[in-house]
Design a protein with these regions (language model features):
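ATP-dependent adenylation/nucleotidyltransferase module used to activate substrates
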Residues: 2-140
Length: 140
């Protein structure tokens, strides 16, 4: 399979766009798609300050990076949910990413705020994902 733009070997196939791209051309395509979406829906202007919620996963980090590259004034927000098996790793990824790319970062620590997810889960008597969702939805 060949890249739609440069004819190099494609590494990403997008059947919904009837396209395939090499890594470099995909990054350009993705960036253009984000910019088009922002403009067509009038989501923000380059003068706006944008707070991007960062989980530490590829989707939120990719969005933060492309918005920064497009010239938007972005700040990251990470909610440390105090889940012993996953929160320290996610927080570390977000901190390293923001440091590496020079993005400002705000961290809200739910343990320090008296709302660690394991304790909230016990009180709600619900699965941990339910407790996490409630905190993210209603606390912020």
């Amino acid at each position: 399979m060949k890249c739609r733009r440069c004819k190099a070997t494609a590494v990403v196939a997008l059947p919904s766009h009837n396209s395939a791209f090499c890594a470099d051309c995909f990054l350009e395509f993705f960036s253009r798609q984000v910019q088009k979406g922002i403009e067509s829906h009038r989501l923000m202007t380059p003068e706006d300050r944008v707070l991007v919620a960062l989980s530490g996963g590829k989707d939120s980090l990719a969005l933060m990076l492309v918005l920064g590259q497009l010239g938007y004034n972005v700040t990251g927000l990470h909610i440390d949910l105090a889940i012993p098996d996953s929160s320290p790793a996610a927080r570390g990824v977000v901190e390293r990413f923001c440091t590496m790319h020079g993005f400002p970062l705000i961290i809200r620590d739910m343990d320090a705020g008296g709302l660690p997810i394991p304790r909230v889960k016990e009180r709600l008597n619900r699965p941990i994902c339910s407790a996490c969702g409630k905190i993210k939805r209603y606390f912020f």
